[in-house]
Amino acid sequence: METSAATALVTGAFRGIGRAVAHCLARDGFQVYLTDVSEPEEAALAIRDIEEQGGRARAFRLDVSDVQAVNDFFAAEIKNKVQLAVLVNNAGITRDGFVIRMQDEDFDRVLAVNLRGAFACLREAAKIMSKQRCGRIINISSVSGQMGNAGQVNYSAAKAGLIGMTKSAAKELAGRNVTVNAVAPGFIETGMTAVLSEEVRAAYLEHIPLKRLGQAGDVAEAVAFLASDRASYITGQVLAVNGGMYC
């Protein structure tokens, strides 16, 4: 795959893991399209980081839970405009709570962004990549989708759903030379984990053999590998980036 002529689309890319993924893919030669619903200032910072390393990037505001907005975005900015080589479904939110107290809207909203939004992007990317007869789709799942996590019934369900979607889509698209894989991060230093108390962090570390939280760059490098030619014979897999936490 000639990366200098190829575009990688990363959702939820203005900060955290998504921003690190965009940075790595730009480093590897892709033109990167970043989407998110975060503030414009965060978009500007993400673009600046990429351009300062000599990369090419554009930022777009996109709520992936709005299926029509996703379809419109692909029609306006992707289809017949660029060679879409990579899609990274990273957009995600949390609305934690114990199951007996969880509100319907909190369950539905997390699935709308984390699972249905990923599906909407995957579907549009698959149409384009199938015609190209090449492409890489990488879904960001989570250790919570593999092992479950108390207080995250909605989040865990969505991330487990991403794994099932990954494996099914991989079987459907393999004949078109499109690979579909997932990356399942463990506990990573991001805005989502920054709010954890020291007591909670210490409890998590007890279950991580490497005795540290991961960095966004650890996940980004795994994504960059799956997006590369080195991973051309890998599809339908879940790459765990979790410091040794095993299901």
What label would you give each PLM region?
Residues L122, S130, C134, R212-V241, ...:
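C-terminal substrate-recognition "lid" of short-chain dehydrogenase/reductases
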Residues F30-L45:
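Conserved glycine-rich Rossmann-like NAD(P)H-binding loop of the short-chain dehydrogenase/reductase
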Residues F14-R15:
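Conserved glycine-rich cofactor-binding loop
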Residues S142:
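Residue(s) in the substrate-gating loop at a strand-loop-helix junction
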Residues K127, K171-G175, S232:
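Alpha-helical segment proximal to the catalytic Tyr-Lys
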Residues L122, A158, T166:
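Active-site helix of classical SDR
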Residues F98-V99, Q103-L111, T193, Y204:
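Substrate-binding pocket helix/loop in short-chain dehydrogenase/reductase
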